């Protein structure tokens, strides 16, 4: 695992705080499976689901329980939460922001996934960001490469009235856009040859695809098949895909469907299958 950021450890030590660890079982499947088999010292936030679902869901645990699992730093799907609140209060707060007020809801926000968490922060209202941030002195999440970063929290004013966790229509649309590149990269992960400049760095991969999608959507592309084809082209093309996409004859001609696929075929350079 990667080291915790020094700013996080210094803040915890200077203020005599303890940490809780929030884990995404879908991103850390071996750990999620172990927790589902031996949950002592940890809380499944999917408590009402079958064991298989709990294994893939979010888990909240003490620092000691995390250490017993070998968690001593940052990795994808692992979050360190510094708070003065009790574990029970943290659990309640996380459940509220993951599923809303409806305890029977099957629509969950993946707060333990750093990608999803940052996407949500980008679409929440100011009041929502402040209400979510209230319990945390610090929140350390891992980026797409597993490196630790501190979440930008909002503590400028106190929330005096309840704040809805619901997303409006425009927020939902913005969230879909914010998560689109990750979703398409995931779908194509075993199907697309990867350019050598993108191997070993998921952040570069995401940046290249997201920039290509932004230009394509600005040019009028909205069909998911077309956007998937352009994502595959970006993954084959590499880090210079954002500068090359505007020059593509296929985009200039507004090609779509099979014509776009045929035009993009062979456009990319040195590609290697990889993850």
Which role fits each region the language model picked out?
Residues 70-71:
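Short acidic/His/Gly/Ser-rich catalytic and metal-binding motifs that mark active-site loops
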Residues 77-82:
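Aromatic-anchored, charged helix-turn/loop surface patch used as a conserved interaction hotspot
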Residues 2-47, 51-63, 83-88, 95-97, ...:
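A contiguous, surface-oriented mixed alpha/beta subdomain in the mid-to-C-terminal portion of proteins
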């Amino acid at each position: 695992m990667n080291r915790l950021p020094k700013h996080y450890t210094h803040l915890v030590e200077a203020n005599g705080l303890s940490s809780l660890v929030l884990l995404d079982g879908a991103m850390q499947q071996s750990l999620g499976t172990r927790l589902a088999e031996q949950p002592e010292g940890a809380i499944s936030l999917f408590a009402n689901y079958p064991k298989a679902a709990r294994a893939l869901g979010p888990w909240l645990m003490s620092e000691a329980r995390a250490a017993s699992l070998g968690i001593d730093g940052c990795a994808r799907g692992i979050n360190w939460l510094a708070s003065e609140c009790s574990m029970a209060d943290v659990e309640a707060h996380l459940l509220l922001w993951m599923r809303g007020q409806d305890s029977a809801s099957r629509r969950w926000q993946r707060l333990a996934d750093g990608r999803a968490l940052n996407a949500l922060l980008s679409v929440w209202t100011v009041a929502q960001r402040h209400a979510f941030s209230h319990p945390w002195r610090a929140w350390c999440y891992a980026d797409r490469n597993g490196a630790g970063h501190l979440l930008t929290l909002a503590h400028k004013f106190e929330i005096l009235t309840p704040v809805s966790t619901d997303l409006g229509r425009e927020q939902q649309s913005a969230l879909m856009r914010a998560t689109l590149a990750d979703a398409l990269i995931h779908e194509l992960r075993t199907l697309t040859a990867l350019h050598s400049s993108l191997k070993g760095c998921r952040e570069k991969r995401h940046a290249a695809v997201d920039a290509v999608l932004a230009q394509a959507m600005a040019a009028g592309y909205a069909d998911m098949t077309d956007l998937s084809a352009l994502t595959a082209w970006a993954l084959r093309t590499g880090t210079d895909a954002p500068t090359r996409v505007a020059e593509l004859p296929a985009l200039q001609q507004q090609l779509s469907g099979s014509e776009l696929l045929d035009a993009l075929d062979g456009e990319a350079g040195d590609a290697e299958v990889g993850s």
